[in-house]
């Protein structure tokens, strides 16, 4: 076993005899997860499924002898995961027809089967008892909620009971005190039903994963001020004391499954930091300290970008490829401040591969289901674990970055590491930081968990996606058309072969068959390869570019003075037009004069409100309007 975490425990935190029960429990839960993962090999394949029935069938094939990622065949999530995981085999499962059994029974069967249950048994407790094993936590979902796909995967992977409760709302709502009390009673009821001890940290149940839509905030009588974060309420007693750490997963079937699979199967060895705080007073403590020296000693990569808006924009040309991100900023739900400028969620980097994120910022997760917020945009980019606030938290509510890294290197799970322990800080009480994702996910030093990788095997119930790629490319060559090249490029993008996609794009150009479909399939690869000229050419013939495609245009091309100004002027993004116009206004002034800038501002003002409206009105005065 790697001794680095033990050394860090002794030197960076406190001696074992001084540890609080909560601190001991933090180490214990991380150690239990690590022990479990070392014992369960990963099969080096990804299986793509067309529907939930096929998904559940694949999860039921898992065992303690081998588990593998199962993803819905939906982009951009599937290709994003594959680019990071780099499987030896990518398989497409044959469709399994939907079962007539209640979905609760189907989910429980899949979980129990992954632990050796026979003849359709549904009790994970009985199966675990036969193995003399205690669960690592409990997973709670709703039978009608699409995020049940994550619940099944996490329950099956770790051997956790899966429990079902009713609906409790979603989005930007706030549970009132009466509703919060009722939710506490319901959660406690299902925890009691498991038959495992859960009343205090360090007993049998120390983690709860809520896989369902919930309001991000609630009013709790045990809090010193309301509202508080929903995930910092669940797992506490009425007096506010914590008995479990909670993670929260929500979203579509595809997105929820993606979040679970990222947590379970991806390595996290590359870290990315963006520090926008001044090096003074309390802000300094929330800077990066000695992180740049600490992480390489743990065998981890460390990238620190300039905290200016320009620095962020330059780092994002072609997208960001990393595993764990930490960014600090001031701001609100719809903007964030860099060192020198204020910007909108539109400037949040595009992620080429999945990432976990700690965002030290106020309000970012106020309404995480709304894409055009800071938190919602990060999640739409492919963040699968997220530490952030859902209300004004105060800076000290966050664990400082250097302390966060020490905890992670010492074996704390990612979401657990973000919580203050009782007695350390007044914000250890129920407060406003939400923790999205799997609460058991680790971010340890390199080689701390060496999971065995098993060779995959192809069988008649699967199709090899590489065979599909070969056939599609051959068809495009023999019968060149916009449709056929687009089909081939969709597959090469899925398997993470951007250079091959670019080659197909070039071949389609040579054969004079490029059309809107081919262009649309080319854009993501051209973006990641930073082929700006080709990207612009393709973008011009895409019909009705979607939000992500517009973001790629701006993130790749807006800083380049050779980019034709007309394409940027025609693609100013709402509802944050002020930031786009501010970026290109100097170029418009040179080519179209002040009237060109004012026309763009006047058009944007028709739909503007809030900060966007105020900034546009200020700019209008600046340019003589």
Regions found by a protein language model. Give the residues of each.
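Cysteine-dependent hydrolase recognition
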Residues: 50-58, 76-89, 94-515, 524, ...
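Short coil loop/turn residues that delineate tetratricopeptide repeat
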Residues: 513-515, 544-548
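The tetratricopeptide repeat
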Residues: 484, 518, 551-552, 580, ...
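Alpha-helical repeat scaffolds
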Residues: 500-508, 532-545, 564-576, 580-581, ...
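Sec-dependent N-terminal signal peptides
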Residues: 3-12
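N-terminal low-complexity, Pro/Thr/Ser-rich intrinsically disordered segments
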Residues: 15-45, 116-120
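Terminal, low-structured helical/coil segments at or just beyond the last alpha-helical repeat
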Residues: 598-625
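Structural register within alpha-helical repeat arrays
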Residues: 488, 521-522, 584-585
């Amino acid at each position: 076993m790697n001794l680095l975490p033990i050394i860090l425990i002794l030197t960076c935190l406190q001696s074992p005899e001084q540890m609080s029960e909560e601190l001991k429990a933090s180490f214990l839960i991380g150690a239990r997860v690590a022990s479990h993962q070392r014992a369960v090999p990963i099969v080096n394949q990804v299986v793509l499924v067309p529907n939930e029935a096929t998904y559940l069938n694949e999860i039921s094939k898992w065992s303690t002898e081998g588990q593998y990622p199962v993803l819905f065949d939906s982009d951009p999530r599937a290709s994003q995961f594959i680019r990071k995981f780099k499987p030896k085999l990518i398989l497409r499962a044959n469709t399994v027809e939907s079962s007539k059994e209640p979905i609760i029974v189907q989910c429980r069967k899949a979980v129990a089967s992954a632990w050796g249950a026979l003849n359709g048994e549904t009790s994970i407790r009985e199966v675990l008892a036969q193995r003399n094993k205690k669960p690592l936590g409990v997973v709670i979902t709703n039978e009608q909620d699409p995020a049940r796909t994550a619940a099944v995967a996490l329950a099956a992977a770790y051997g956790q009971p899966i429990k079902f409760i009713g609906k409790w709302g979603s989005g930007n709502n706030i549970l009132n005190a009466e509703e919060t009390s009722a939710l506490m009673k319901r959660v406690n009821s299902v925890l009691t039903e498991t038959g495992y001890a859960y009343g205090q940290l360090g007993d049998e149940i120390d983690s709860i994963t809520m896989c369902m839509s919930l309001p991000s905030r609630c009013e709790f009588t045990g809090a010193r001020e309301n509202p508080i974060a929903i995930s910092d309420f669940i797992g506490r007693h009425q007096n506010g004391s914590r008995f479990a750490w909670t993670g929260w997963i929500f979203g579509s079937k595809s997105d929820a499954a993606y979040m679970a699979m990222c947590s379970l199967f991806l390595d996290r060895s590359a870290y990315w930091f963006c520090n926008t705080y001044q090096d003074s007073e309390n802000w300094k403590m929330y800077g990066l300290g000695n992180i740049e020296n600490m992480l390489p000693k743990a065998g981890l990569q460390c990238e620190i970008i300039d905290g200016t808006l320009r620095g962020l924009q330059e780092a994002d040309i072609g997208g960001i490829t990393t595993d764990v991100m930490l960014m600090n900023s001031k701001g609100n739900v719809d903007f964030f401040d860099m060192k020198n400028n204020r910007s909108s969620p539109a400037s949040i980097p595009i992620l080429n591969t999945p990432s976990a994120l700690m965002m030290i910022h106020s309000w970012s997760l106020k309404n995480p289901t709304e894409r055009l917020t800071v938190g919602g945009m990060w999640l739409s980019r492919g963040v699968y674990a997220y530490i952030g606030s859902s209300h004004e938290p105060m800076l000290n509510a966050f664990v400082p970055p250097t302390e966060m890294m020490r905890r992670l290197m010492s074996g704390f799970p990612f979401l657990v590491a973000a919580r203050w322990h009782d007695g350390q800080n007044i914000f250890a009480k129920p407060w406003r930081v939400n923790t999205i994702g799997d609460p058991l996910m680790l971010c340890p030093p390199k080689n701390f968990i060496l999971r065995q990788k098993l060779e995959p095997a192809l069988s008649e119930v699967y199709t090899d996606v590489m065979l599909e790629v070969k056939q599609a490319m051959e068809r495009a060559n023999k019968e060149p058309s916009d449709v056929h090249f687009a089909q081939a490029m969709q597959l090469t993008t899925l398997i993470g072969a951007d250079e091959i996609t670019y080659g197909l794009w070039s071949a389609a150009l040579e054969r004079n068959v490029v059309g809107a479909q081919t262009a649309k399939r080319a854009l993501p690869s051209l973006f990641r390869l930073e082929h700006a000229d080709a990207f612009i050419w393709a973008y011009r013939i895409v019909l009705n570019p979607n939000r992500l495609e517009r973001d790629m245009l701006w993130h790749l091309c807006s800083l380049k003075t050779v980019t034709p100004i007309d394409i940027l002027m025609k693609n100013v993004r709402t509802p944050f037009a002020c930031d786009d116009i501010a970026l290109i206004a100097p170029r418009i002034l040179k080519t179209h004069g002040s009237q060109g800038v004012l026309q763009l501002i006047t058009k944007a003002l028709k739909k503007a409100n809030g900060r966007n409206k105020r900034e546009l009105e200020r700019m209008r005065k600046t340019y003589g309007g």
